[in-house]
Amino acid sequence: MNTAIVLAGGSGKRMHSEIPKQYMQLNGKPVIYYSLKAFEESEHVDEIILVTAKEYIEYVRNEIAGSQFAKLTKIIEGGKERFDSVWAGLQQISEKGYVYIHDGARPCINQNIINACWETVVQTDACVAAAPVKDTIKVADADEYAINTPDRKTLWQIQTPQVFSADVIKEAYSRLYEQNCFDGVTDDAMVVERYGNSKIKLVNCGYCNIKITTPEDMEIAGIFLKG
């Protein structure tokens, strides 16, 4: 069975909102709606697990879930950090099949992205949606002085979904929690890099799959979704 774990535990602090960004309105729908819809319509996904804050579980059940999302089989409580929420989701699935892990604040995911990741993961066991960096990147010291300029040709900006064979990602996360070393863990690919044996293939998914973090992102995502 192939599962999509959709993370909806973020806050709205940088959006200057008391409502988590995943539940803010975007083109007349909650932001999270678009991710759920994309996975619901995918032939490569059998079930969806939504991980959210405890206080929003009933809201999701009453206002978002329903017949339109038949694949949404579980709505569960997340953890304090992103990796805690992913781990909570992973404990709900079997060792077989593939797992899409996706940030619910990326509403512009589409079938092309899902399909491209699928075609890659069945060959590699581990891949992430990404895009080559367009801007020059500087490494700074503690005083915000530039100290180094990495070769831009080697840099990619990482997105979601991050897709893995279920046994690969569950084993990596199990070892993460066994080692109890969470410093610097920002995404799932990093967990596999540290504790797995699979190389991570980057899948060029372009620049429209943005993560909503600021009010400006909401405006841009709205334009992308209108197509």
Swiss-Prot record:
Pathway: Isoprenoid biosynthesis; isopentenyl diphosphate biosynthesis via DXP pathway; isopentenyl diphosphate from 1-deoxy-D-xylulose 5-phosphate: step 2/6. Its EC number is 2.7.7.60. The record marks R14, K21 as: Transition state stabilizer. The record marks R152, K211 as: Positions MEP for the nucleophilic attack. Pfam families: IspD (PF01128). InterPro entries: IspD (IPR001228), IspD/TarI (IPR034683), IspD/TarI_cytidylyltransf_bact (IPR050088), Nucleotide-diphossugar_trans (IPR029044). One of its GO terms (molecular function) is 2-C-methyl-D-erythritol 4-phosphate cytidylyltransferase activity. SUPFAM superfamilies: Nucleotide-diphospho-sugar transferases. The keyword Membrane does not apply. It catalyses: 2-C-methyl-D-erythritol 4-phosphate + CTP + H(+) = 4-CDP-2-C-methyl-D-erythritol + diphosphate. Keywords: Isoprene biosynthesis, Nucleotidyltransferase, Transferase. GO terms for biological process: isopentenyl diphosphate biosynthetic process, methylerythritol 4-phosphate pathway. It comes from the Bacteria. NCBIfam families: ispD. Catalyzes the formation of 4-diphosphocytidyl-2-C-methyl-D-erythritol from CTP and 2-C-methyl-D-erythritol 4-phosphate (MEP). PANTHER family: 2-C-METHYL-D-ERYTHRITOL 4-PHOSPHATE CYTIDYLYLTRANSFERASE, CHLOROPLASTIC. Belongs to the IspD/TarI cytidylyltransferase family. IspD subfamily. This is 2-C-methyl-D-erythritol 4-phosphate cytidylyltransferase. It comes from Lachnospira eligens (strain ATCC 27750 / DSM 3376 / VPI C15-48 / C15-B4) (Eubacterium eligens).
